[in-house]
Each structure stands twice: as C-alpha cells, then as structure tokens.
C-alpha cells in the first residue's frame, strides 16, 4: 500500500473509476448482445429499437474514454450491417 498521501488518493480514485468503467462497459456489452439476439431471431422491429439503445451506450462509452472512438464506430457499423441484412 502507498505511504504518500497523494498516492493513497490515486489508489482510491482509480478504484472508483475502475468500478464505474466496468459498469458502463458491461451495460454496453449487454445492449449489444440484446441486438444480436434479436437479429438471430429475425425480429427486425425489435432489433432496430434495441440498436438505438445500444448505439447510445456505445457512444457514451467512447465519449468517456472507456473504448476508442474508432472501436465504437466499428461496433455500430457491424450491428447496423447485421440489421440491414435482415
């Protein structure tokens, strides 16, 4: 464990950020899985509405630096292509 006050604070702040980032990343992945499940079931209307929610979560994660912007764009593009293929 760190002895210096600033190092102790960094440990605490990093832990809080890690937990927050983990929650947001998990929520994003869950939304993506819901879209993919709807696509597998050939449920176009549901997939489109779920895609909007997933897109929002992906953009939020990219905006907060949890994932890279290019990775976010790639994920949204691949989901959109799957939906358009229905």
From Swiss-Prot:
It comes from the Bacteria. Binds directly to 16S ribosomal RNA. Belongs to the bacterial ribosomal protein bS20 family. GO terms for cellular component: cytosol; small ribosomal subunit. The gene is rpsT. Keywords: Ribonucleoprotein, Ribosomal protein, RNA-binding, rRNA-binding. Gene3D superfamilies: Ribosomal protein S20. GO terms for molecular function: small ribosomal subunit rRNA binding; structural constituent of ribosome. This is Small ribosomal subunit protein bS20. Pfam families: Ribosomal_S20p. InterPro entries: Ribosomal_bS20, Ribosomal_bS20_sf. It comes from Oceanobacillus iheyensis (strain DSM 14371 / CIP 107618 / JCM 11309 / KCTC 3954 / HTE831). GO terms for biological process: translation.
């Amino acid at each position: 464990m760190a002895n210096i006050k600033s190092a102790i604070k960094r440990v605490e702040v990093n832990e809080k950020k890690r937990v927050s980032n983990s929650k947001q990343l998990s929520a994003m992945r869950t939304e993506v899985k819901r879209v993919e499940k709807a696509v597998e079931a050939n449920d176009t209307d549901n997939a489109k509405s779920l895609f909007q929610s997933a897109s929002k979560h992906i953009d939020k994660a990219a905006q907060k630096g949890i994932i890279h912007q290019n990775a976010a764009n790639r994920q949204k593009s691949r989901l959109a292509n799957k939906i358009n293929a229905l």
